[in-house]
């Protein structure tokens, strides 16, 4: 009870949220609405037990990621998994971690599952502790009545989709480091990038001091400077889907109408025999 009261006091002085082109994707640590959402903590169990956002449910998203990669994350899978952590279609879900790649990956999987309102806690656990907000150590257990989710296939791109998109001139955006993009560094048989891809490393979307997403004007300027057309369908990719999820989130936050995450990413593309590659090795 005391923790709840302290949390309410801290949240009472919240500042209004930033005005991004796509609203209700981010939530600040001091936002009063956090009292009325399902909060998921995707950090390691030991970190959760050491202290977490009051009322947060620990969600182990690793099995979700494996199922998505294996093409086994169907409606029945999400029906069982999301019920375990108390996710319902009527309550917003807020995800946080100590690494925005984990938060974004989980956000993206929730959207893939068909969750209508999923958001990221801006700045994650770092922002929560920086604001000196209350913490608790007691585990929160929350279950929900299993729901028949309708997964959204438009969130996911596979290799065939990307190959087809190349013919249609869609936007591919590479979230990896510059050395990975140019081919100087490789974690697959082939090095380089998908032909015609635009390079926008995932960390560029964030304030390095706070781990928060750039303010609206700065985010939009960054995207426009890279000549990314937010009205065209976009595909993001990296090595294994996590960095690409950050980029997918950032592009949608900036106003992109259609963004897919090529989840197998370079781990598949760079090892396949039928995929074209561009390289800018010196």
Located regions from the model:
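Short, hinge-like loop/turn segments at secondary-structure boundaries
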Residues: 135-138, 189-190, 276-280
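C-terminal soluble interaction/assembly domains
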Residues: 221-222, 226-282
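Positively charged, proline/Ser/Thr-rich regional signature most characteristic
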Residues: 16-90, 163-231
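Active-site-proximal beta-strand/loop segments in catalytic clefts of secreted hydrolases
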Residues: 42-43, 59-62, 96-98, 121-123, ...
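Phosphate-coordinating loops and pocket residues in cytosolic domains that bind phosphorylated ligands
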Residues: 50, 130, 271
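Hydrophobic h-region of N-terminal signal peptides that target proteins for export
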Residues: 3-15
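Thiolate-centered catalytic microenvironments shared by cysteine-dependent enzyme domains
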Residues: 13-21, 67-69, 73-160, 184, ...
């Amino acid at each position: 009870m005391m923790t709840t009261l302290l949390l309410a006091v801290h949240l009472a002085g919240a500042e209004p949220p930033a005005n991004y082109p796509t609203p209700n994707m981010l939530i600040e640590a001091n936002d009063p609405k956090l009292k009325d959402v399902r909060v998921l903590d995707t950090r390691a169990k030991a970190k959760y037990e050491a202290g977490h956002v009051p009322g947060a449910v620990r969600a182990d998203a690793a099995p979700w990621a494996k199922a998505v990669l294996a093409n086994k994350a169907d409606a029945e899978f999400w029906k069982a998994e999301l019920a375990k952590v108390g996710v319902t279609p009527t309550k917003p879900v807020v995800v946080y971690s100590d690494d925005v790649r984990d938060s974004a990956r989980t956000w993206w999987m929730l959207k893939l599952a068909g969750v209508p309102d999923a958001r990221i806690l801006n700045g994650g656990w770092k922002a929560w502790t920086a604001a000196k907000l209350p913490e608790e150590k007691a585990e929160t257990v929350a279950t929900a009545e299993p729901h028949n989710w309708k997964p959204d296939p438009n969130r996911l791109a596979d290799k065939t989709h990307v190959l087809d998109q190349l013919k249609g001139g869609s936007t591919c955006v590479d979230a990896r480091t510059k050395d990975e993009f140019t081919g100087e560094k490789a974690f697959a048989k082939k090095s380089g990038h998908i032909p015609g891809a635009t390079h926008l490393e995932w960390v560029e979307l964030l304030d390095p001091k706070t781990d928060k997403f750039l303010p609206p004007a700065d985010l939009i300027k960054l995207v426009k400077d890279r000549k990314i057309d937010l009205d065209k369908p976009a595909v993001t990719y990296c090595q294994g889907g996590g960095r690409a999820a950050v980029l997918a989130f950032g592009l949608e936050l900036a106003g992109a109408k259609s963004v897919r995450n090529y989840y197998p990413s370079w781990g598949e593309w760079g090892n396949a025999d039928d995929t074209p590659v561009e390289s800018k090795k010196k």
